[in-house]
A protein has these predicted regions:
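Catalytic cores of Mg2+-dependent Asp-rich isoprenoid enzymes
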Residues: 1-168, 172-280
C-alpha cells in the first residue's frame, strides 16, 4: 500500500508544479523522463513552503510554518509523511542523499519572510538568496548528476549563479507586489519610493553577471538535463531583457510577464539554439 501512496504523493507534487508555474513545468518537460518526477518533488516542496509565507494572510502563518517545518523534519527522519508533498520530497531527498544543510538553509530563508521586511546590507541579502534559491538549484543539480560528488562540486558554483539570477529576476518582476502587498524590499540600499533608472540598471547588471556565469555551467551539464535547464535560462533571460526595456516607474506599477504564446516561441528558439550549438 505504501507504493500506491507514493505514486499519489508524486502526482500531487506534479500537479502543484503544473498549477503554479507554466514556465517551470515547460522546462521540466524538457528534462529526461527519468528525472522529471524528482524535480517535481523538489518544486512541490519549495512551492508549498513559499505559499505559507507569501499567500495565507488570513491564517496564523507562523503557526502553519512551524507545523510544516516539524512535519518536514519528521518526514526526513521517518522516511514517510501523510502530507503527500513532503512524502514525495523526502523520497527524493534520500534517493540522492541531499545534504541536510540545503534544506535547513532553505527553511531559514523562508522563515525570514515571516518577519524580515527589508535587507539593508549585502550579507543578509546574499544569505537570503542562497537559502531561497541557490540551494534549490543545488538540490536539482544533485538529481542531474545522479549524486556524483565530483561532478556536483565541479558544477556547484554555476548552479548557484543560475539560482541567484532566477531569484533576482523574480524580485525585480514582483517589485510592486512585494513592496505594496507584502511590505518587503529585498534589494539593499534601494529607495522604492524613488526607484530610479540607475537603481534598475545596477540591479540588472548584477543579474546579467550571474546569468553569464550560470550559462557556462549549462554547457557542462549531463545530457539528461542540459536542454531543460537551458530552456529555463532562456525564459528568465528573456524576462530580464523585457524588464530592462521597461522604465523603472512602470516596474513599480505593474507586473511584467512573458505571455504563454511567447513562451512557446522561446521553447522553439531554445530547441534551435541547443541543437545547433548557438547558445546565447
Amino acid at each position: 500500500m505504501k507504493e500506491l501512496f507514493d505514486v499519489v504523493s508524486e502526482k500531487c507534487s506534479e500537479k502543484v508544479t503544473k498549477s503554479y508555474s507554466t514556465s517551470f513545468s515547460m522546462a521540466t518537460k524538457m528534462l529526461a523522463t527519468s528525472i522529471q518526477q524528482d524535480i517535481y518533488n523538489i518544486y512541490g516542496f519549495v512551492r508549498l513552503s513559499d505559499e505559507i509565507v507569501d499567500s495565507l494572510h488570513d491564517y496564523d502563518k507562523e503557526l502553519l510554518f512551524n507545523r510544516f517545518e516539524e512535519d518536514l523534519k519528521n518526514s526526513i527522519k521517518e522516511k514517510i509523511s501523510l502530507n503527500p508533498i513532503l512524502n514525495s520530497f523526502q523520497h527524493t531527498f534520500h534517493k540522492y542523499s541531499f545534504d541536510i544543510e540545503l534544506v535547513n538553509s532553505f527553511m531559514k530563508s523562508m522563515r525570514w519572510d515571516l518577519h524580515k521586511k527589508k535587507y539593508s546590507n549585502k550579507t543578509d541579502y546574499n544569505e537570503y538568496i542562497y537559502g531561497s534559491a541557490d540551494v534549490v538549484g543545488l538540490m536539482c543539480l544533485n538529481v542531474f548528476v545522479d549524486g556524483d560528488t565530483k561532478k556536483y562540486n565541479e558544477l556547484k558554483q554555476y548552479a548557484m549563479s543560475l539560482g541567484s539570477a532566477f531569484q533576482k529576476v523574480n524580485f525585480l518582476r514582483d517589485l510592486k507586489n512585494d513592496f505594496e502587498n507584502l511590505n518587503r524590499s529585498y534589494f539593499p540600499k534601494v529607495n522604492f519610493f524613488d526607484f530610479s533608472e540607475n537603481d534598475k540598471n545596477n540591479i540588472i547588471a548584477e543579474i546579467e553577471k550571474d546569468f553569464k556565469n550560470g550559462l557556462k555551467g549549462i554547457f557542462l551539464l549531463p545530457n539528461n538535463s542540459r536542454f531543460g535547464v537551458y530552456t529555463a535560462y532562456k525564459y528568465y533571460f528573456s524576462l530580464l531583457k523585457k524588464l530592462k526595456k521597461t522604465p523603472s516607474k512602470f516596474i513599480l506599477s505593474t507586473r511584467i510577464r512573458i505571455p504563454n504564446y511567447a513562451k512557446m516561441g522561446l521553447l522553439a528558439e531554445s530547441y534551435f539554439n541547443y541543437h545547433f550549438n548557438t547558445y546565447k
